[in-house]
Amino acid sequence: VERYICIHGHFYQPPRENPWLEAIEIQDSAYPYHDWNERITAECYGPNSSSRILDDQQCIVRIVNNYSKISFNFGPTLLSWLEDKSPAVYQAVLAADRLSQSHFSGHGSAIAQVYNHMIMPLANRRDKETQVVWGLRDFEHRFHRKPEGMWLAETAVDLETLDLLAQHGIKFTILATSQARSARRIGSTRWRDVSDGSIDPSMPYRITLPGGRTMTLFFYDGPISRAVAFEGLLNQGEYFASRLAQAFSDARDWPQLVHIATDGETYGHHHKRGEMALSYAIEHIESTGIAKITNYGEFLERHPPFREVRIKENTSWSCVHGVDRWRADCGCNSGMHAGWHQQWRAPLRDSLDWLRDQLASRYQKKGREFFRDSWRARNNYVRVILGRSQETIGAFLATECVRPLNDSERIEALKLLEMQRHAMLMFTSCGWFFDELSGIETVQVIQYAGRALQLSQQLFGDALESQFLDKLAQAKSNLNDRPDGRVVFEDFVRPAMVKLETVGAHYAISSLFENYPAESKVYCFDLNRTDYRLLSAGKMRLALGRAFVRSEIVFESEHVSFGVLHMGDHNVTGGVRQFQGDEAYAALCAEIGEVFERGDLPEVLRIVDRYFGDGSFSLRLLFRDEQRRILRLILNQALEEAEASYRQLFEHYAPMMRFMADLHIPPPRRFQIAAEFTLNSTLRRALEAETIDLDNVYALLDETRRTGIALDTQTLEFAMRGATESLAQKWFAQPDDVALLQSLSDAAGLAAAFPFPVDLSQAQNLFFKLLQDVYPSYSARAAQGEPDPKEWVSAFLNLGDRLRVRVG
C-alpha cells in the first residue's frame, strides 16, 4: 500500500497597517525589530526559506527551502507586505512554489486563501464572493498560475462558501476532523456518523454541494497537528518524523495520506528552530523511504476520492462552539486573563454588520453613477490593489465605468471602492479572536471601520459615525479606563485619522529636522513643495511654506500653506490650512518674518494662531515613526551630555569596581548603573561603526566580564548581527576580495566572543551560495599551486569553520 505524507503550513499575520497611511507604524513590543511582521519574518518566514540541516557535529551540511517540500498558503495581505519590505523572502516563497512543481508532478505547493481572513460563514454572500475572487486574483498575480486549493480562515466553513469555491474552480480545501458530520463510500446508501471526530483522515473525501457541484475535502490529522503546535513535537526532527510514520496503519488497504495542518509560524516563531526540525523530518522521511512526501494537488490527481462526506456547517478549527468565537462570549479565549469576559464580541459584530449594510446601500446607489456593475467593479478592484499606478487605475476605470470620468468623479469612484475595501478589512477574524476589546487586533478592525466611516462622510456627508458609536458603546471592555467601544474609538481610532492637512503638518514639522527635496513622499501621499522659507534666530527656527499634498490611493489633492516654529527641545508649534492665495500667503510671510526677526515670540505665536486657527498643531500630530526620530534628534545633545557624565564616573571608579569584582563584592548600584550604561552604549556604537575596531570591542567585552556588568543582549545581538550581515553582503557582491573575506571572518570570530548566541544565518546563507558557485573554481586553482587562490581558499575555510558550515 502506497504511503504519503503532506505537511501544511498556514502562514498568516493580522494586517497591522495604519489604514490611513497604508503602512505599519513602529511597534515597541516587537523590539529590537520595527514591528511584528518584521520580527516574525526574521524568526519564521526567512528561516523557512533557508533552513539548516546539521551533521552530528552541529555543522551545516545543507540549506533547504522548506516551502518547496510542504503544502502552504500565505495570507494575501502578508504577501503584499513581504513583497514590499522583505523582497528576498518573498521571492524565495514564489521560487519554492515553482520548485515544488518539479517535486510533485507539476502540482505547486502553494494554495490560495480568502483575502483578508474573514470568517466566511458569518459573512454575507457578496462579501464571500469578493473574498474568494480577491484571494484568487492575488494568488494568480503572484504565482502566475491558478490555485488548486484555497484555505478558509480558521477553517470556518459552510456549504455556501464551499459552493463559491467550487464555482470558481477550486478543487479542494482542508478542514479539521471535528468538522465532518457523516461519511460513506461513494455509491453506498448508508451514511456513517463521524460527528465525534472519528472520520479517517488518511484519504480525500468528495462533497456534493446543494447546486450539484462537487469538490474534495481533506481532514487533517488532529492529534499530530496539536502535538506539533502545542506539545513539543518539534523539539527533535527525528521524533517528528517518527510520529508521522506511526500514523500509518497496516489495516488500511488504500493509498494512505498522513497529513497535518498548523499555523506556519509554529516553525520558527512559536517554536525556536522549529523550521530545522521540519527540514530534518522531511529529509529523514525521504532518505529512509518511510513514505513519499507529497502535496494535496499531486495526491488528489493520483488518488481521487472513493468516499464522500457531509460537513457540520458553521464550524472551525479553533472554536469548539462552531464559529461563536467571532460573535459571542462562548468561553474560547487565550486563557491568559482569568475572569475576563468576551461579551463585547456580539455588539462588535452587530455594529460592524450594521455599518457594512449601511455602506453597501450607499455604495450601490452612488455606484450606479459611475460603474456598469457596482459589485463586479468591487470584485475587479483587486487589480488596482495589486498595483496602484496611473496606468492600472486608468485601465480599471475605463473597463468598469459607464463613461469617462472627470477628476472629481474619479476621486469619488475611488473613494467608493476604498470604502468597500475597508468595509471588508474590518471583518478580519483577529478582531474577535483574543480576549479584550481594546487589544491591538480589535482596535485594528475598528480602525478599518473608522476609515470606511470617514470616506462615507466625505462622499455623503451623513451622520453614520454617531449612530455607529452608539451601537459600539454596547461593547463593554474588561478595563475600567476604556469601558466600552465608544471610548476605544475615541482613544485609538480618532487620533489615528489622517486628512490631507495632517500630512501637510507632518511635512512642515519634519522639514525643521530634515532637508526634503521639492518633490517627496510621506507614506501613501505625494508632496510637491511650491515655496519654502526657513528663518533662524538663536535656538529658534521658523519654517514657512506651501505645498500640494496628493493621496496615491484616491488621487485627492489639496494645496496647503503652513508655518511651524521650533523654540528648542520638544517645543514645536505651528499651523496648516488650505492655501488662501498668493496675496494672503505673501502677507503672512512678511508679517511673521518681521516679527520673528526682532525676536517677539509671543507675537509670532499670536500670528500663527490668528492665521491658522483650528489648523494648529504640535509634535503630538507627527506620525509615530517620525515622531520617534525627531525626538531622538532633539534628545541627542542631552543624551550625549548624560553619557559623558556616566563615562566620567565609570572611568574614575573602574579600577575600584574591578578590585571589588575580584573580591566578589557587589559594587554600589550607582556605579553599576554608570558602568552598564557606558559599556553597553560604547559597544553598540563600536558595532554600528563603518569599520569595527576589533581590539576595542574585545577589550570592552573583557571589561564587562571583569566587572560583572550585564550586557543589553537584544540590542547588542541585533547590532552584531547587522554588522556581520553588512559585511557578508559586501563580500557576496565582490567574492574575489580577500580583504572583505577576512573582515567577515574576523566579524564571525568576534560574534563567538559574546556571552550570548548571535544569529549569523544571513552570512551563512551567502557563504553557502558561494560554497556552491565560487569555491569549486578557487579550490581547483589552489590545488594546482596558484598562490592567490590558495590564500582565498585558506580564508574561506577559516570562515566556514567560524560560521559552522561544513566545506567538502
State the predicted function of each range.
Residues 4-9, 13-126, 130-131, 144-152, ...:
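Short, well-structured secondary-structure segments
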Residues 2-55, 62, 76-77, 191-513, ...:
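Active-site and substrate-binding clefts of carbohydrate-active enzymes
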Residues 1-6, 646, 650:
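Mature N-terminal, pre-catalytic/accessory segment of carbohydrate-active enzymes
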Residues 91-104, 108-109, 133, 145, ...:
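Acidic, His- and aromatic-enriched active-site or binding-groove loops in soluble protein domains
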Residues 64-65, 82-86, 178-180, 184-199, ...:
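Extended, Lys/Arg-enriched charged tracts that mediate electrostatic binding to polyanionic substrates
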Residues 141-189, 264-284:
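Catalytic domains of cell-wall/extracellular-matrix polysaccharide-remodeling enzymes
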Residues 650-808:
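Extended alpha-helical scaffold segments
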Residues 627-631, 641-652, 658:
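Extended, well-ordered protein cores
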